[in-house]
A protein has these predicted regions:
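C-terminal luminal/periplasmic domains and tails of membrane-associated envelope-modifying transferases
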Residues: 3-10, 17-145
Length: 145
């Protein structure tokens, strides 16, 4: 291999390393969501987003707790509660049962100490969705402390 080829290979490896380091903890990930529809407003003026069967959003890693408002408009068969599993970076935080379709349930959960990343991933797994639009539960504005 010639000296020029060694230089090109070293430059390509350096660029690849920089990209990997950048994508390990990207600064823009805090605004990324998955499984959540756009913001809507119900008649009393509460802002919310519909989930699908699974939803993901990111919160700052220095947050010590968060309050997640949830509402299940479509109860399960025979009025069974809709269950929402909350996870923090794949670690189970809690399972919330939503029994009243007319009530917002605001659950505050503690978060573990932040790691080396700027943001942590919060996952919601909803036990029941209603077709044809795969609507899960209504999720309000999450408050972090």
């Amino acid at each position: 291999m010639t000296r020029a080829n060694w230089f090109k290979a070293a430059a390509a490896l350096a660029v690849a390393g920089i990209v990997v380091v950048y994508l390990y903890d990207p600064p823009w990930i805090g605004g990324v969501t998955s499984g959540l529809r756009g913001w809507e407003q119900d008649p009393p003026g509460t802002f919310f987003r519909w989930t699908t069967g699974r939803a993901t959003f990111f919160v700052p890693s220095n947050a010590t707790s968060m309050t997640v408002p949830l509402r299940a408009v479509f109860p399960g068969p025979d009025g069974t509660p809709v269950k929402v599993e909350l996870r923090d970076d794949d670690r189970l935080l809690t399972t919330i049962e939503l029994t009243d379709p007319d009530a917002w349930v605001r659950t505050t959960v503690p978060l573990k100490r932040g790691g080396r990343r700027r943001f942590r991933r919060i996952d919601l797994k909803i036990s029941r969705v209603v077709g044809p639009f795969y609507l899960g539960v209504m999720t309000g504005e999450v408050v972090m402390r």
